[in-house]
UniProtKB/Swiss-Prot annotation:
PANTHER family: CHROMOSOME TRANSMISSION FIDELITY FACTOR 18, DNA LIGASE
Ranges for domain BRCT: 593-670
Obligatory cofactor(s): Mg(2+); Mn(2+)
Source species: Vibrio campbellii (strain ATCC BAA-1116)
EC primary class: ligase
EC number(s) from the headed UniProt entry: 6.5.1.2
Family: Belongs to the NAD-dependent DNA ligase family. LigA subfamily.
Molecular functions per Gene Ontology: DNA binding; DNA ligase (NAD+) activity; metal ion binding
SUPFAM superfamilies hit by this protein: BRCT domain, DNA ligase/mRNA capping enzyme, catalytic domain, Nucleic acid-binding proteins, RuvA domain 2-like
Reaction(s) the record says it catalyses: NAD(+) + (deoxyribonucleotide)n-3'-hydroxyl + 5'-phospho-(deoxyribonucleotide)m = (deoxyribonucleotide)n+m + AMP + beta-nicotinamide D-nucleotide
Protein name: DNA ligase
Binding site for Zn(2+): 409, 412, 427, 433
Active-site residues annotated for this sequence: 116 (n6-amp-lysine intermediate)
Length: 670
């Protein structure tokens, strides 16, 4: 082995250690991730050829090694104690008074405050700057040796940086899993059909206690330091906060929210600030930790039983509690989604009394295996809707019963559907369901549907709230006199609305189909249906097999269409609309052997049209057999360009696509 290989190995190790600190501690990377990965691969290659050169501080150990049969035990030289808790300002005041009373002649001036991370406490022992041991807290006296696993956590330096560190230094802190990493871990587990973790704390603990460190290496774990234990060979600062800064200078990350304050009132303000920002933080916390900053006063205060007298955890209101699931009700949302809602024995959680929690959908009920009567764990975080996160199955009563999804909508009685591959169950009575009424009516009168001037969202909401309309057909039964009872609706405005409704009765089949709000039937699909079947009766009677023959209609959309027209209540509204006078020009069938002018052509509209509205031009093109798209590509056959055409025209010219004018379109329409 040459000296150059050994020198390169040391260079790579030093560089990787340096850049890990820049990335994980200082949040200020100097090189791209790809360059870091390249150096790591080079290091792994050298060590693979020369395994005798692998040292305990090698960055290569972050990928994990051979599985252990069990964890060995570690006795803590300085006990790892837990903290007493405060749950309100009065208890915090009591902590401060007790501490102040014990140090007569000294004034406690400053406190060091930090978020209380919801993870796993660990001890890191460095000798001569190299990480030689990592252990869990265990019972405070004895923990488990998790050195191999901790070495895989990128945020923890295998070798200290800078200078001035003690020859033996024990750093204590919290291993945790950031929220984003937790979500991604569970998402991947669901895709693979594997068990998911209940919360980030369980995920962090489970990941850190793997006998196979390669599994730990694959988990998104991080670390923040919060104190020291053993210190030999150097003197640290006499301030808890300044010790944090020393530790950080040696390459160990500290929580960026850590702050030194000058009074108990500032401690309380810090607590409120962190509580307010809790949900926005990248990691889970369950309170704040408050420590006397002066180390000399810490030493005078000492410890009592299992906890220091100089520190306390000011806990947030609990985000999880246990209660009984008494019943399940099914609510229908504005789009027809049916959501199971757990009716709970009221419980105080997350700062409020909770009596309802979402169960999301049938898949979630199946995953939880929850039943009515179960003892369940409820979680409420910030403004998030409370949810059932787990079931205590060993407490299940004999009277517990299965939760069954309804076959009919609990609001309107229409059939419900659940498309294969979708989690949501929906009501099919979009035109009649009270829960969906406002959204259905707003869609019906929208510009791309019946296009009724004067019937904006606020008018629709008033009409529904006053129970003046139930279905779209009821709109055409309104008189100007009736409409004047609405807010900001004078006689003239009311007359204009009635006239607009009358005008909208003459429409087109594509617009009418679109106005019905059939799931996933947009403008293009409605146009394709009209062009293929030519009339409404044929569409209503079409089978799924026939519908799939239509351009751009697949199995799912075909199912939505047959389900919609298969619901008698929807059919009744359609017939009522026709009875109110809605009509459209007949779509002529093409003559035998004669193709439509733009049959099979893909076209794009761009620019300002002087004689046609954009929707009108689009409908005309579709009636001429064209497929209208929104962007120019190699598949585009014709670009119809109006005035002030911009980038689409330039791209069409570049691709050599045929370009026509608005007048060309008008000529085709004659």
């Amino acid at each position: 082995m040459s000296e150059s290989v050994l020198q390169r190995l040391e260079e790579l190790k030093e560089s990787l250690h340096y850049h890990a600190v820049r990335y994980y501690v200082e949040d200020n990377p100097e090189i791209p991730d790809a360059e870091y990965d390249r150096m790591m691969r080079e290091l792994l290659d050298i060590e693979a050829e020369h395994p005798e050169l692998v040292t305990v501080d090698s960055p290569s150990l972050r990928v994990g090694g051979q599985p252990l049969s069990e964890f060995s035990q570690v006795t803590h030289e300085v006990p790892m104690l837990s903290l007493d808790n405060a749950f309100d300002d009065a208890e915090l005041d009591g902590f401060h008074k007790r501490a102040q009373d014990r140090v007569v002649g000294h004034t406690i001036k400053q406190y060091c405050c930090e978020p209380k991370l919801d993870g796993l406490a660990v001890s890191l022992l460095y000798e001569n700057g190299v990480l030689v041991q990592a252990a869990t807290r265990g019972d405070g006296t004895t923990g488990e040796n998790i050195t191999e696993n901790v070495r895989t956590i990128s945020a923890i330096p295998l070798k200290l940086q800078g200078k001035g560190w003690p020859t033996r230094l024990e750093v204590r802190g919290e291993v945790f899993m950031p929220k984003a990493g937790f979500d991604k871990l569970n998402e991947n587990a669901r895709k693979k059909g594997e068990k998911v973790f209940v919360n980030p704390r369980n995920a962090a603990a489970g990941s850190l206690r793997q006998l196979d460190s390669r599994i730990t290496a694959s988990r998104p774990l991080s670390f923040y330091a919060y104190s020291v234990g053993v210190v030999e060979g150097a003197t640290l600062a006499n301030s808890h906060y300044e010790r944090f800064l020393q530790i950080k200078s040696w390459g160990l990350p500290m929580c960026p929210e850590t702050k030194r304050v000058d009074s108990l009132e500032e401690v309380k303000a810090y607590y409120q600030d962190i509580l307010t920002r809790r949900e926005a933080l990248a990691y889970e916390i369950d309170g704040v930790v408050i420590k006397v900053d002066d180390i000399a006063i810490q030493e005078r205060l000492g410890f009592v039983a299992r906890a220091p007298r100089w520190a306390i955890a000011y806990k947030f209101p609990a985000q999880e509690e246990i209660t009984t699931l008494n019943e399940v009700e099914f609510q229908v949302g504005r789009t027809g989604a049916i959501t199971p809602v757990a009716k709970l024995e009221p419980i105080f959680v997350g700062g409020v009394t909770v009596s309802n929690a979402t169960l999301h959908n049938a898949d979630e009920i199946e995953r939880l295996q929850v039943m009515v009567g179960d003892q369940v764990v409820i979680r409420r975080a910030g403004d998030v809707i409370p949810q059932v996160v787990s079931v205590i199955k060993e407490r299940r009563p004999e009277t517990a019963r299965e939760i069954l999804f309804p076959d009919a909508c609990p609001v309107c009685g229409s059939h419900v559907e659940r498309i294969e591959g979708e989690a949501v169950t929906r009501c099919t009575g979009g035109l009649v369901c009270q829960a969906q009424r406002k959204e259905a009516l707003k869609h019906f009168v929208s510009r791309k549907a019946l296009d009724v001037d004067g019937l904006g969202d606020k008018v629709i909401e008033q009409l529904v709230d006053r129970e003046m309309v139930e279905t779209p057909a009821d709109l055409f039964k309104l008189s100007a006199g009736v409409l004047t009872v609405l807010e900001r609706m004078g006689p003239k405005s009311a007359t204009n609305v009635v006239n607009a409704l009358e005008k909208s009765k003459l429409t087109t089949l594509p617009r009418f189909l679109y106005s019905l709000g059939i799931r996933e039937v947009g403008e293009a699909t409605a146009a394709n249906l009209a062009q293929y079947f030519k009339n409404l009766d044929a569409i209503q009677q079409a089978t799924e097999e026939q519908l799939i023959e239509v351009q751009d209609i697949g199995v799912i959309v075909a199912k939505h269409i047959t389900t919609f027209f298969g619901e008698e209540k929807n059919q009744a509204v359609v017939q009522d609309l026709l009875a109110q006078g809605i009509n459209w020009p007949e779509i002529a069938a093409p003559q035998e052997g004669v193709e439509l002018p733009l049959e099979g052509k893909t076209v794009v509209l761009t620019g300002t049209l002087s004689q046609l509205g954009r929707s009108e031009a689009k409908e005309a093109l579709q009636n001429l057999g064209a497929k209208v798209t929104g962007s120019v590509s190699k598949k585009t056959d014709i670009l119809f360009a109006g005035e002030n055409a911009g980038s689409k025209l330039a791209k069409a010219q570049e691709l050599g696509i045929e370009i026509q004018t608005e007048q060309d379109l008008l000529n085709l329409m004659k």
